[in-house]
Amino acid sequence: MQYTEIMIRYGELSTKGKNRKDFINRLASNVQKVLHDFPDLKIQTHHDRMHILLNGTPFEPVNDRLKVVFGIQTYSPVIKTEKSLEAIEKTALELMQATYKAGMTFKVNTRRSDHKFIYDTNQLNQMVADYLYNHMEGLQAEMKHPDMVLLLEIRQDGAYISNQLLHGAGGMPVGTAGKAVMMLSGGIDSPVASYLAMKRGVNIEMVHFFSPPYTSEKALAKAKELTSILAKYSGRINFIEVPFAEIQETIKEKLPEGYLMTVQRRFMLRLADIIREKRHALAIFNGESVGQVASQTLESMSAINDVTTTPVLRPVATMDKTEIIAKAEEIGTFDLSIQPFEDCCTIFAPPRPKTKPKIDKAREYESRLDVDGLIERALAGVKVTPIYPGQSFLDDLDEEDADLL
């Protein structure tokens, strides 16, 4: 049976008071963006619901896109009909006949925002259920845990009937919390942190440090492909490449081994902060988890954060590694994250880094370096690439390699 539209129920938008309209408009824009290649769809927004008119478009391919849009609490494919008992009963029967299977239990659940409608919710539940019993064989009612719930919603403009209540991605529409930069490595943690930042409405741009010839083109392609996976949640993400080899070489040559990691991270944070300012962003996100590695002790974080007053936010800070891995598997980044391409965080990793570095020591060692010159030359090599959902980078690189053989 052909659904006529999709009814979307907002999540936390219902609590946003005077900003509610802006949040709803942003959600509509994000939905429009992910459904841009379905020309027959039409989006209508209301204060408590959004409607996507399908106009003949099948529900399933639209559902595949819609389920990853942040800001949607639940949604249902519905059939809209006129607000009369006869039309409601007829449409309910057609939907049940098309989807009900022998042995399933069901119940009718009615909501009514039009309180002037002649029947109340209990009456509608009973009358529609009786009608179905009289026109179908073998129906079994179950009030607590039915296999199918027939949803009726009586609104001012008509009656909406569905047999599915689907859970959306939740959270806030991407863009409603402003823009930030994300320090993206090629590992497991930072893609999960990116997902969680977007879920809170943050529009993120990826900052990725690479160090050719020490890091390969495949390591860079891997980071871009991780960004492509995450882009399905926002429609597009800008990927910012920052060359980092000269800085790493200089630090390794001139500073004590125990402070290599701390000073490298301080340079990364400086660069991310300058890029943030140039990109008109408000904060810096990363994938650090407290105590997971030497650079992620509170003492290390404090010594690294010393170079900026910009908020540095860590969405996975209190998560166990097993929790982060589970989320990475859920969002589809795990298998790619564990591909063995070394990134710049691992190639110069000292065997015995300081786990409790001192801020004054880090400052003293940096005074031996041409910090401004190193930063300036790294920024001169920055490259920005817009990345879209579904783009492939590793496969394209493999094809280029094959062409050379």
Curated annotation (Swiss-Prot):
Its EC number is 2.8.1.4. The keyword Mitochondrion does not apply. It comes from the Bacteria. It is found in: Cytoplasm. GO terms for biological process: thiamine biosynthetic process; thiamine diphosphate biosynthetic process; thiazole biosynthetic process; tRNA 4-thiouridine biosynthesis. GO terms for cellular component: cytosol. One of its GO terms (molecular function) is tRNA binding. ATP binds at residues 183-184, 208-209, 265, 287, 296. Pfam families: ThiI, ThiI_fer, THUMP. Keywords: ATP-binding, Cytoplasm, Nucleotide-binding, RNA-binding, Thiamine biosynthesis, Transferase, tRNA-binding. Transmembrane segments: none annotated. Pathway: Cofactor biosynthesis; thiamine diphosphate biosynthesis. InterPro entries: Rossmann-like_a/b/a_fold (IPR014729), ThiI_AANH (IPR020536), ThiI_fer (IPR054173), ThiI_N (IPR049961), THUMP_dom (IPR004114), THUMP_ThiI (IPR049962), tRNA_STrfase (IPR003720), tRNA_sulfurtransferase_ThiI (IPR050102). The keyword Cytoplasm applies. It catalyses: [ThiI sulfur-carrier protein]-S-sulfanyl-L-cysteine + a uridine in tRNA + 2 reduced [2Fe-2S]-[ferredoxin] + ATP + H(+) = [ThiI sulfur-carrier protein]-L-cysteine + a 4-thiouridine in tRNA + 2 oxidized [2Fe-2S]-[ferredoxin] + AMP + diphosphate; [ThiS sulfur-carrier protein]-C-terminal Gly-Gly-AMP + S-sulfanyl-L-cysteinyl-[cysteine desulfurase] + AH2 = [ThiS sulfur-carrier protein]-C-terminal-Gly-aminoethanethioate + L-cysteinyl-[cysteine desulfurase] + A + AMP + 2 H(+). Residues 60-165 form the THUMP domain. NCBIfam families: tRNA uracil 4-sulfurtransferase ThiI. Belongs to the ThiI family. HAMAP family: ThiI. Catalyzes the ATP-dependent transfer of a sulfur to tRNA to produce 4-thiouridine in position 8 of tRNAs, which functions as a near-UV photosensor. Also catalyzes the transfer of sulfur to the sulfur carrier protein ThiS, forming ThiS-thiocarboxylate. This is a step in the synthesis of thiazole, in the thiamine biosynthesis pathway. The sulfur is donated as persulfide by IscS. This is Probable tRNA sulfurtransferase. It comes from Lactobacillus delbrueckii subsp. bulgaricus (strain ATCC BAA-365 / Lb-18). The gene is thiI.
